[in-house]
Amino acid sequence: MATPLLELAASRGVCFPLRARRLTLTPFRGLDAPAVWSFCRREQVWSWTSGRPESENALRESYLGAGDRLTVRAGDVIVGVGKVAVQDAWSQGGPREEARDAQAEIGWTIDPRQAGQGYGTELARALLGFAFNDLGVRRVEAHAFADNAPSLRIMEKVGMRHEGTFKEESLHLTRGWVDGATYAMLASEFHSSLTQE
C-alpha cells in the first residue's frame, strides 16, 4: 500500500511550503476549506472534477481524509487546489519494493475567478516537479473528462503524453456516461524536458 503523501514527503526531507514562480503550495488544512468551498461548490468547477461536494464540511473531511491535497496561493489569496496521490505501481508476482510509491496521479482545480492567468499550467508544472524531484516517483498520470479542453491543454503544455481516450468510461453526475482521457509522463521525460528549456 502506498505511503500517505505527507508521510512520504517528510521521509524524503521535503519542507513546505513548495514554491513555484507565482504560486505557493501547502498541505490542505481545515482552515482552507471556506475559501476552497467558495469555488468548488460552483457547477462550473465540480462538473469537471471527481464530484460535487455536499457541503463545506464534507469537502473539508474529504480532503483531510484523502491527505493528498495541496492548497495553492498567489500571494495571500487561495487560487486553487492541487492533488498528488502517490500509488504503488502494479508489479507482476505481487508487491515488490521497487514498485512501492513509484507513481502518482496529479490533478488541479483553479478558482474560475482566477482563470486566464496561467495558474493551471504553473500548478501542473509544480506538481510534476514535486512528484518527480521531491517524492522520487518514476511515472505521473493525469486524468480528465475528454471534453475538458482547458485541462487537456494544460497537460499538453507541460509535456505530458496522451496515452488514451476511453469511451464512456466515467459516470458523470448529470451527463451520464462520458469519455475520459489519460495523460502521463515518466521521470526521464520530465528531466529531459528541463534540459531542453
Regions found by a protein language model. Name each.
Residues 1-44, 69, 73-197:
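Acyl-donor (CoA/ACP) binding surface of acyl/acetyltransferases
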Residues 52-74:
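Active-site rim helix/loop that mediates acceptor-substrate recognition in acyltransferases
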